[in-house]
Curated annotation (Swiss-Prot):
Annotated function: Probably part of an ABC transporter complex. Responsible for energy coupling to the transport system.
Species the sequence originates in: Methanosarcina acetivorans (strain ATCC 35395 / DSM 2834 / JCM 12185 / C2A)
Matches recorded under CDD domains: ABC_cobalt_CbiO_domain1
Protein name: Putative ABC transporter ATP-binding protein MA_4021
A cellular-component GO term for this protein: plasma membrane
Membrane topology: Peripheral membrane protein
Keywords: ATP-binding, Cell membrane, Membrane, Nucleotide-binding, Translocase, Transport
InterPro entries referenced in this protein's UniProt entry, alphabetically: AAA+_ATPase (IPR003593), ABC_transporter-like_ATP-bd (IPR003439), ABC_transporter-like_CS (IPR017871), ABC_transpr_CbiO/EcfA_su (IPR015856), P-loop_NTPase (IPR027417)
Length: 276
């Protein structure tokens, strides 16, 4: 398999007026684990939606699996062979779980994707039961998705993505709203999927998750452009970069003659530094 995604000088504007992506260019190769990080409103979720073929560039060119993604071809022609191929290869996790859930039961929710593939009903059932067991959702298979807790809904949404066994996972704020135990479980799952060769791209401002599952970080600035595209360790050790892109912020306090400085991410506990 060649390059998975290739973005060339892409910009995107809502209703042709509000620009949320500016001059975005990068490539994604098979097996990469990438984090797209930036403050709220920097364009992370919009970029993921574009990678999933849900929206199309206002300016520039987007290629997926060496095919140019053009709305007139990708989204409007019935029985589009490449679109079907794309949907089997790429799985998308929405930030808001309720957007992704629509079936009467948990079992039917997970079965929906595999039923669109050319496999037998028996194979669908086997696959669904395996995924439910892996996600620790078997006891909930007859429940309505909308009666589940937030963490259970997130697990279910991940199950619906994994049920079609995609090569590429696009995950929008996957740890948002999860308790610490479920966050740890999800982190370990993503590490395992990465070791299996899955291509994983997440949009997040959870820097701890970025450090644990990614090797490459694409940093979005508040001007909706890519500021840095590079090694995760170098990015996370660059405090000036993290401060300038509003991924961490600092507070200064005086304790007598001691200046007490707090540096912390927006969703994490304070890290402390002292300066005389």
């Amino acid at each position: 398999m060649g390059t998975i995604f290739d973005l060339k000088n892409i910009s995107y504007s809502y209703v042709g007026e509000i620009t949320v992506l500016k001059d975005i260019s990068f490539k994604v190769d098979p097996g990469e684990q990438i984090s797209i990080i930036g403050s709220n409103g920097s364009g992370k979720s919009t970029l993921l939606s574009l990678l999933d073929g849900l929206i199309y560039p206002t300016v520039g060119e987007f290629y997926a699996f060496d095919n140019k993604i053009v709305e007139e071809v990708f989204d409007t022609i019935k029985d589009n062979e490449f679109r079907s191929y794309f949907r089997t290869k790429v799985g998308f996790l929405f930030q808001n779980s309720d957007v992704q859930l629509f079936s009467p039961t948990v079992f039917e929710e997970v079965a929906f994707g595999p039923l669109q593939l050319n496999i037998t009903p028996e194979e669908v059932k086997t696959r669904v039961l395996e995924v439910l067991e892996m996600m620790e959702l078997t006891k909930l298979k007859d429940r309505s998705p909308h009666t589940l807790s937030g963490g259970e809904k997130k697990k279910l949404c991940i199950a619906t993505v994994l049920a079609t066994n995609p090569d590429v996972l696009l995950l929008d704020e996957p740890t948002a709203g999860l308790d610490p135990r479920t966050q740890l479980w999800l982190t370990e799952l993503l590490q395992e999927l990465g070791s299996m060769g899955k291509t994983i791209i997440i949009a997040t401002h959870d820097l701890e998750l970025v450090e644990q599952i990614s090797k490459r970080a694409i940093v979005m600035g508040e001007d909706h452009r890519i500021v840095v595209d590079g090694d995760v360790e170098k990015v996370l050790n660059d405090l000036n970069l993290l401060l300038s892109t509003n991924l961490i912020h600092e507070h200064m306090h005086m304790h007598g003659k001691l200046v007490h400085e707090h540096l912390h991410a927006h969703d994490k506990e304070h890290a402390h530094e002292h300066k005389n």
